[in-house]
Amino acid sequence: MSIIYLVINSFIFILPAYVANATPCIFGGGAPIDGGKCFFDGRRIIGNGVSWKGTFFGLFCGTITAILEGIIFNLNIFGTVAFNFNVFEWGIVGLLLSAGALFGDAIGSFIKRRLGLAQGRPAPILDQLGFIVFALLFVYPFAPVSYEMGIFLLVITPMIHLSANIIAYKLGIKDVWW
């Protein structure tokens, strides 16, 4: 697989997870998933940063992104890609990637609370890779990716995540640059 082919197909495949992970920053807020409850250690289970509204919109936007990819690539508007999914299958892939990304983000928040880190505080590696690892794990039974693609995504995602956060901060979408 050529490097260009790997890069293009990796971004096409993972885009729904990236969208799902970013959407709660824009459309989130409201009631937290943990209901404001505390864990055995007296700290919040997850915190206010993971809400039902953000989760819903993350799932919705990530899945819609994949369905749109399915429509575009099944019409061969931009040529062929490495994935031979019909539109329905793209929707399933998008839902799985989105659910995995959001679950990974929630797990990251859970771990950060156990470590005593307040909401919004940085946790390098955990913040950048938790969502992508779980997105790939959730989708793997339905659409396994190659080792090359998995490694590429694990290497490139922290840089993309940091860049996106800096842009969101400069646009006033996020309160912190990390």
Swiss-Prot record:
It is a multi-pass membrane protein. Catalyzes the formation of CDP-2,3-bis-(O-geranylgeranyl)-sn-glycerol (CDP-archaeol) from 2,3-bis-(O-geranylgeranyl)-sn-glycerol 1-phosphate (DGGGP) and CTP. This reaction is the third ether-bond-formation step in the biosynthesis of archaeal membrane lipids. Keywords: Cell membrane, Lipid biosynthesis, Lipid metabolism, Magnesium, Membrane, Phospholipid biosynthesis, Phospholipid metabolism, Transferase, Transmembrane, Transmembrane helix. It is found in: Cell membrane. One of its GO terms (cellular component) is plasma membrane. The keyword Coiled coil does not apply. One of its GO terms (molecular function) is CDP-2,3-bis-(O-geranylgeranyl)-sn-glycerol synthase activity. Its EC number is 2.7.7.67. It catalyses: 2,3-bis-O-(geranylgeranyl)-sn-glycerol 1-phosphate + CTP + H(+) = CDP-2,3-bis-O-(geranylgeranyl)-sn-glycerol + diphosphate. Its cofactor is Mg(2+). One of its GO terms (biological process) is glycerophospholipid biosynthetic process. Pathway: Membrane lipid metabolism; glycerophospholipid metabolism. Belongs to the CDP-archaeol synthase family. It is an enzyme of class 2 (transferase). The chain crosses the membrane at residues 3-23, 55-75, 91-111, 125-145, 149-169. This is CDP-archaeol synthase. The keyword Phosphoprotein does not apply. It holds the Pfam family CarS-like.
